[in-house]
Amino acid sequence: MLPPALNIPKWLEANSHLLQPPVNNYCVYHPSSPATSGYTVMIVGGPNARTDYHINSTPEFFYQYRGSMLLRTVDRSVSPPAFQDIPIHEGSLFLLPANTPHCPVRFADTVGVVMEVPRAPDATDTMLWFCPNSACKQVVWEKRFVCTDLGTQVKEVVEEFSADLAKRTCAACGTVAESRYKEGELTQPPRFPPE
């Protein structure tokens, strides 16, 4: 028998305490479940001010349930890489193409749903940090791994980067990259898109 549909408001009422930093997500449909056919569906809350970019070998589907978020992306097919911020407003959908470096920035009192399609068993995910010096923007550090548990593995990589000054120091210009955005460094997009 199939499970009932997930009621997001009721789920949040009972489980919002599960959306804790640094990842702020909870996997409501896990890829190991026979019912999901390998799909991952997460509810993600804010705030989440991590500065890392994630590369997933498959597309990711974003639905912004409450409030607005900022999806920071990088096009590495051009030189220098092109950085683009994509606001995802309340009630909006966005499909991120596979292999696109992205940094989902979530603000306080926001909730979104992210769905990831099944990865190949040997597919590697990448987490990377770019130099915050606007004249440089080189990759400061990156780590590749086979993703078996997004919530725990992402947290471990973020903590590894945060704890090591050498990993956070840009080899090209010497600027130190932080693992979190500073308060007020980014502006939250409006809740709804401008008319």
Swiss-Prot record:
Cofactor(s) demanded: Fe(2+)
Alphabetical keyword list: Cytoplasm, Dioxygenase, Iron, Metal-binding, Oxidoreductase, Pyridine nucleotide biosynthesis
Top enzyme class: oxidoreductase
Record-linked CDD domains: cupin_HAO
Superkingdom of origin organism: Eukaryota
Endpoints of the signal sequence: none
Name under which the protein is recorded: 3-hydroxyanthranilate 3,4-dioxygenase
Species of origin: Aspergillus terreus (strain NIH 2624 / FGSC A1156)
